[in-house]
From Swiss-Prot:
Signal peptide: none annotated. InterPro entries: YjhX_toxin. This is UPF0386 protein Smed_0945. The lineage of its organism: Bacteria, Pseudomonadati, Pseudomonadota, Alphaproteobacteria, Hyphomicrobiales. It comes from the Bacteria. Belongs to the UPF0386 family. It comes from Sinorhizobium medicae (strain WSM419) (Ensifer medicae). NCBIfam families: PRK13687.1.
């Protein structure tokens, strides 16, 4: 799966325990916020990036909870230690 640097940054925050919360007005998404595991808001998420990650099935929401990373969104890496 080819992903851009911006997508990699977001997926990295999510893999460390972050989440993406959305605010809706009816069916329209009005606001998207990415929270790190420490509770800080990461400003690099917009609607286009959110839709790309959703289309690639890298993130998913279950039971109305915030969006989290899926197994498909996590890529394996060698342990360099």
């Amino acid at each position: 799966m080819d992903i851009s640097r911006a997508e990699q940054r977001i997926l990295h925050h999510l893999a460390q325990g972050g989440r993406i919360e959305i605010t809706r007005e009816g069916k329209t998404i009005t606001e998207i916020r990415c929270f790190t595991r420490d509770g800080w808001v990461y400003p690099g998420v917009d609607l286009e990036l959110f839709r790309k990650l959703k289309r690639k099935r890298a993130i998913r929401s279950s039971a109305g909870k915030p969006y989290r990373i899926t197994e498909r969104g996590v890529r394996s890496e060698l342990n360099n230690r």
